[in-house]
Amino acid sequence: MVSLSIPSMLRQCVNLHPDGTAFTYIDYERDSEGISESLTWSQVYRRTLNVAAEVRRHAAIGDRAVILAPQGLDYIVAFLGALQAGLIAVPLSAPLGGASDERVDAVVRDAKPNVVLTTSAIMGDVVPRVTPPPGIASPPTVAVDQLDLDSPIRSNIVDDSLQTTAYLQYTSGSTRTPAGVMITYKNILANFQQMISAYFADTGAVPPLDLFIMSWLPFYHDMGLVLGVCAPIIVGCGAVLTSPVAFLQRPARWLQLMAREGQAFSAAPNFAFELTAAKAIDDDLAGLDLGRIKTILCGSERVHPATLKRFVDRFSRFNLREFAIRPAYGLAEATVYVATSQAGQPPEIRYFEPHELSAGQAKPCATGAGTALVSYPLPQSPIVRIVDPNTNTECPPGTIGEIWVHGDNVAGGYWEKPDETERTFGGALVAPSAGTPVGPWLRTGDSGFVSEDKFFIIGRIKDLLIVYGRNHSPDDIEATIQEITRGRCAAIAVPSNGVEKLVAIVELNNRGNLDTERLSFVTREVTSAISTSHGLSVSDLVLVAPGSIPITTSGKVRRAECVKLYRHNEFTRLDAKPLQASDL
């Protein structure tokens, strides 16, 4: 029996479309207009086998191969070559400096790679990052672009059934103690079946023949890896790719690449929709028709309904269809995907009383009032339940609890972390409802609720702000702030004299134009909005320059680090109001 795996499905693509274009990478670093380089399926396969042959010289089946390379075709070939060799791939970012490199160091210590795959351009930066303490042998480092990648195939095909883990997807949480989620081919293929059923429900769960993937997401992030590298192989379609830097430099490039001939399927976090709506100008979009875009998935972080509306309103004149925007929920522990909005319909937004939410209950309110949340149909696969984490019993509709997930897409656990694996992946329900399995359940650590047979997400339980005894979602408070400032912000609770006080860190653009009057205006507007919408007073509003708020490698705010920086008075304030010791 032929096992289904990424390498075996790559072979199928070669058999069906040997000369078809597989991956096209647009390099905007060498030329601002973009230099395009493409590989056919045959070329991808040949290069993958040659990388695998080199990898097998240094490591055995089941060993770890870390990929530390810039975004590009070499990264894809390195990742696929590691899989083809039967190793466990560990995708990481190229060394960037700062907290990013701390994370790389921690992952290397945890994964203990037997070989490192990189490129010649950054070899000098990579070697110090993977050099172990004295007395421990360094893993060999291979520059894949220096191999004779297009030589006659010289690698044997590995029996995929021998592999229990395909790759380790390290989470973007703690920098110093990262956890590697063990993803199997069974997880990947199950998750793709779930995604295809949901995203193409309006076309009989069959992707259109002219579908292509467009992604600028980093390959070391779960959504970027699954969408940019795995999806083209599993779906059997081409991909047009570029880098996160290319997007950040000119967000309009994202729209331009999606408007190519064919039906684009893309994805991005919420901030990308906000940035594109604000920065893309009509001159960049002249002549573009966005009407053929099949799907733009919005996930990886809390989805703000107001951001999606701004995005659609901004680009509807270029024929962007509202139902092409698909809010989504997922996490690395479930491979990547759990739920999305209804196919063929605009995102459905419901409104709830903020004070009831802070008390643990979901009470609907009039449209346009209260807290706006995206509505998701409860998926049949995977199974989702809202659970009281203290009693392990299912919550009734309208009661906030922890989101638990059960399905073949849920990973087996964390690499060499049995205790954390049991806590996170070993959930068992007490007296489950009819048709609901006892376990095992993935405890996501996210809070949510069910209302009128729809599923709603609030945010990370560990990030909940407890102010004067009531729970408040930092995501909701940050959404309120961003409606005024349009920039990154962080809502944190800081202990002070036995209670926790709300502090907001707010990044403001156009530093040169930030006079006292504007700073005062922003302060008044933000504090008033938080008071009106959430019934909270802001103990301190910290105005800072862009880039001041620490984030993870996937762009999420590191709130615990924000608390630390605030308490140590390490934010450089634009309002020149340093924290006093007496304030704590």
UniProtKB/Swiss-Prot annotation:
The chain crosses the membrane at residues 199-219, 225-245. One of its GO terms (cellular component) is membrane. Catalyzes the activation of long-chain fatty acids as acyl-adenylates (acyl-AMP), which are then transferred to the multifunctional polyketide synthase (PKS) type III for further chain extension. Involved in the biosynthesis of sulfolipid 1 (SL-1). Its EC number is 6.2.1.57. InterPro entries: AMP-bd_C, AMP-bd_C_sf, AMP-dep_synth/lig_dom, ANL_N_sf, FAAL/FAAC. The lineage of its organism: Bacteria, Bacillati, Actinomycetota, Actinomycetes, Mycobacteriales. Pathway: Lipid metabolism; fatty acid biosynthesis. Keywords: ATP-binding, Fatty acid metabolism, Ligase, Lipid metabolism, Membrane, Nucleotide-binding, Transmembrane, Transmembrane helix. The keyword Lipoprotein does not apply. Belongs to the ATP-dependent AMP-binding enzyme family. It is found in: Membrane. This is Long-chain-fatty-acid--AMP ligase FadD23. It comes from Mycobacterium tuberculosis (strain ATCC 25618 / H37Rv). GO terms for biological process: Actinobacterium-type cell wall biogenesis; fatty acid biosynthetic process; sulfolipid biosynthetic process. Disruption phenotype: Disruption of fadD23 increases binding affinity to human macrophage-like cell THP-1 and shows a lack of sulfolipid 1 production as compared to wild-type. NCBIfam families: PRK05850.1 (NF004509). It catalyses: holo-[(hydroxy)phthioceranic acid synthase] + hexadecanoate + ATP = hexadecanoyl-[(hydroxy)phthioceranic acid synthase] + AMP + diphosphate; holo-[(hydroxy)phthioceranic acid synthase] + octadecanoate + ATP = octadecanoyl-[(hydroxy)phthioceranic acid synthase] + AMP + diphosphate; dodecanoate + ATP + H(+) = dodecanoyl-AMP + diphosphate; hexadecanoate + ATP + H(+) = hexadecanoyl-AMP + diphosphate. GO terms for molecular function: adenylyltransferase activity; ATP binding; ligase activity. It is a multi-pass membrane protein. It is an enzyme of class 6 (ligase).
